[in-house]
Curated annotation (Swiss-Prot):
Subcellular location: Cytoplasm
NCBIfam families: leuB
Listed GO MF terms: 3-isopropylmalate dehydrogenase activity; magnesium ion binding; NAD binding
Catalytic activity: (2R,3S)-3-isopropylmalate + NAD(+) = 4-methyl-2-oxopentanoate + CO2 + NADH
Protein name, UniProt field: 3-isopropylmalate dehydrogenase
Coiled coil (residue ranges): none
Record site: Important for catalysis: 145, 195
One Pfam family matching this protein: Iso_dh
Cofactor(s) named in the record: Mg(2+); Mn(2+)
HAMAP family reported in the protein's UniProt record: LeuB_type1
Pathway the protein takes part in: Amino-acid biosynthesis; L-leucine biosynthesis; L-leucine from 3-methyl-2-oxobutanoate: step 3/4
Length: 363
C-alpha cells in the first residue's frame, strides 16, 4: 500500500497566500507525475490569525501542525500589526514559538546563483561568472541567543548588558551530522565556521566537528574563522559547498549568502528537528507593498516545497523534478518582475503555471 502524507499549509500574510497558491499547483503536478499521496490542510498564522482569532499562533494551528508530516509556511507580518507589543507581533508570536514547540534545531538555507541571472549578483562579473551553489547549515536553538545569564543591570557609567554563548556537546554533534549528511548529497565539502582563536565555545565547536568528521571520510572538512569566512564569501563563493555555522554566525552568513544571489525571491529554507519533521519557508519576508499585485516571485515558496519533499517525505525524485523545472523556466527566459524589466516580466500566477507544467512534463 502506498504511504500517504499530510502537510500543514500556513500561507500567512502579505504575498504568502499568492505564492503559496503556486506551490499548490506544483504539488498537484508532483502528485500526478509521481503518484505520491499527499493531502493538505490550511491554517491561519501571523497577522491574519490575529485579525480572525486574536493571536498570531492559534491553538488550532499548532494542533493541525502536530497532526502533519511537515509544515509549509508562507510569510507573516506587515505594518498593520507593528503597533502591537513585540511578543504579540506576527513574526515573534508565530514563527519562534513554532520553532520551539517542534524543537527545530537545524536551519538549512540553500543559496544558488542560477545560470542567466549573473547580472543580478552584486559581486564583480568575473566572480559571478563562476557561479555558486552553497548550503548554509545553521544551528538554531543554542548559542548566544538562548544562553543564560543574559540581561541588563546597574546604572550610570556602570550600567551594563550581557549575553552568554553556551553550546553543549550534543548540540554541536547533531548539527555537524546534518552538515556532513547534506554534503554527501552534494559536492562532499564542509567548511565549519568558528572563532576558535578567541572563544571557548568555538574551541569546543571545532574539536567536536573534527571528531564527527571521522565518521565521514568521504567528506572533506576545513575550518574558517568567521571574519575570514565573510571575506572569502565575497572573494570567491564558488569555493564553498556546505557551510556549518553556530546560531549567531549562521544568522549573519546565511543572509550574506542570500544577498549575493541577487534575489531573495529565489531562496527557500528548511528548519528540522531530530525526527526529520520540518518547517519550510521562503527566506524573504511578507512584502506587503507588492501583495495582491501578481508580481511576487513564487520560486522561493516552490523550492521550499522541494526541500519539504526531500527532507521530510524522502521524495528525492519529486524534489529534483521541481528544482529541474525551476532551472528550465529560468533557462527559457521566464522572469517575474524582480528579475526582469516590467515590459517582459510574467506574473506570479503564470510563473506557477510554467513551473507546474515543466514538472508534469519532466522538463
Amino acid at each position: 500500500m502506498t504511504k500517504s502524507y499530510h502537510i500543514a499549509v500556513l500561507p500567512g500574510d502579505g504575498i504568502g497566500p499568492e505564492v503559496m497558491a503556486q506551490a499548490h499547483k506544483v504539488l498537484d503536478a508532483v502528485r500526478q507525475r509521481f503518484g505520491i499521496r499527499i493531502t493538505t490542510s490550511e491554517y491561519d498564522v501571523g497577522g491574519i490569525a490575529i485579525d480572525r482569532q486574536g493571536t498570531p499562533l492559534p491553538q488550532a494551528t499548532v494542533a493541525g501542525c502536530e497532526q502533519a508530516d511537515a509544515i509549509l509556511f508562507g510569510s507573516v507580518g506587515g505594518p498593520k500589526w507593528e503597533h502591537l507589543p513585540p511578543a504579540e507581533q506576527p513574526e515573534r508570536g508565530a514563527l519562534l514559538p513554532l520553532r520551539k514547540h517542534f524543537k527545530l534545531f537545524s536551519n538549512l538555507r540553500p543559496a544558488r546563483l542560477y545560470q542567466g541571472l549573473e547580472a543580478f549578483c552584486p559581486l564583480r562579473s568575473d566572480i559571478a561568472a563562476k557561479g555558486f551553489d552553497i548550503l548554509c547549515v545553521r544551528e538554531l536553538t543554542g548559542g548566544i541567543y538562548f544562553g543564560q545569564p543574559k540581561g541588563r543591570e546597574g546604572s550610570g557609567q556602570y550600567e551594563r548588558a550581557f549575553d552568554t554563548e553556551v553550546y553543549h556537546r550534543f548540540e554541536i554533534e547533531r548539527i555537524a551530522h546534518i552538515a556532513f549528511e547534506s554534503a554527501r548529497k552534494r559536492r562532499s565539502i564542509v567548511t565549519s565556521i568558528d572563532k576558535a582563536n578567541v572563544l571557548q565555545s568555538s574551541i569546543l565547536w571545532r574539536e567536536i566537528v573534527t571528531e564527527v568528521a571521522k565518521a565521514y571520510p568521504d567528506v572533506k572538512l576545513s575550518h574558517l574563522y568567521i571574519d575570514n569566512a565573510t571575506m572569502q564569501l565575497i572573494k570567491d563563493p564558488s569555493q564553498f559547498d556546505v557551510m556549518l555555522c553556530s546560531n549567531l554566525f549562521g544568522d549573519i552568513l546565511s543572509d550574506e549568502c542570500a544577498m549575493i544571489t541577487g534575489s531573495m525571491g529565489m531562496l527557500p529554507s528548511a528548519s528540522l528537528n531530530e525526527q526529520g519533521f520540518g518547517l519550510y519557508e521562503p527566506a524573504g519576508g511578507s512584502a506587503p507593498d507588492i501583495a495582491g499585485k501578481d508580481i511576487a516571485n513564487p520560486i522561493a515558496q516552490i523550492l521550499s516545497l522541494a526541500l519539504l519533499l526531500r527532507y521530510s517525505l524522502g521524495a528525492d525524485d519529486a524534489a529534483e523534478a521541481i528544482e529541474k523545472a525551476v532551472n528550465t523556466a529560468l533557462a527559457e527566459g521566464y522572469r517575474t518582475a524582480d528579475l526582469a524589466s516590467a515590459s517582459n516580466a510574467i506574473g506570479t500566477s503564470e510563473m506557477g503555471d510554467v513551473i507546474a507544467r515543466f514538472v508534469a512534463q519532466g522538463a
